[in-house]
Design a protein with these regions (language model features):
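Bacterial N-terminal signal peptides
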Residues: 9-19
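N-terminal secretory signal peptides that target proteins for export/translocation
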Residues: 1-6
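Glycine/tyrosine- and acidic-biased, solvent-exposed loop/turn segments at the edges of beta-strands
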Residues: 20-147
Length: 147
């Protein structure tokens, strides 16, 4: 499991490195290397949908309204949530962190309050809580998938 600051650094690095990834095609500064923004699925100033040329992989990043602070970020593979998920409080501190596999929560998920205190930790297998406490349902990535 990645540490909270590691994910935040990754999201910021994607923004800094993405702009140099491809010079011949329009690339959002928030898209990972090898992906480009899909304007139809992005919402200017609110979120960005990045996808691989073959559309098999995608990354979605949403910002808190009226700010440049990330609200949540997740990756997709073949239309399902796959990989790291992170959500942040409006003040910028990590709120929820976990992993998706085949569109469902797996492994250790954690939740923090706005002051950075851990308030819940749960272990998930195929989307079901098997140990610990349930983690917030902020994970819109469970619902967001390109048709």
């Amino acid at each position: 499991m990645l540490r909270p600051m590691t994910i935040l650094r990754w999201v910021l690095a994607v923004g800094l490195l993405g702009s140099t990834a491809c010079k011949r095609q329009p690339v959002s500064p928030f898209c990972p290397k090898g992906m480009r923004e899909a304007p139809t699925w992005s919402d200017a100033g609110k979120s960005v949908w990045c996808e691989a040329p073959d559309k098999s992989r995608a990354q979605w990043i949403e910002w808190h309204p009226g700010t440049t602070k990330p609200r949540q970020s997740c990756a997709f593979h073949d239309g399902r949530s796959e990989g790291s998920f992170a959500a942040w409080h409006p003040g910028g501190k990590l709120w929820v962190q976990g992993q998706f596999a085949a569109g469902v929560k797996v492994g250790k998920w954690k939740q923090w309050d706005a002051d950075g205190n851990e308030v819940a930790e749960g272990d998930y297998q195929t989307g079901r809580l098997v140990a610990g406490a349930p983690v917030a349902g902020m994970a819109l990535c469970e619902k967001v998938a390109r048709p």
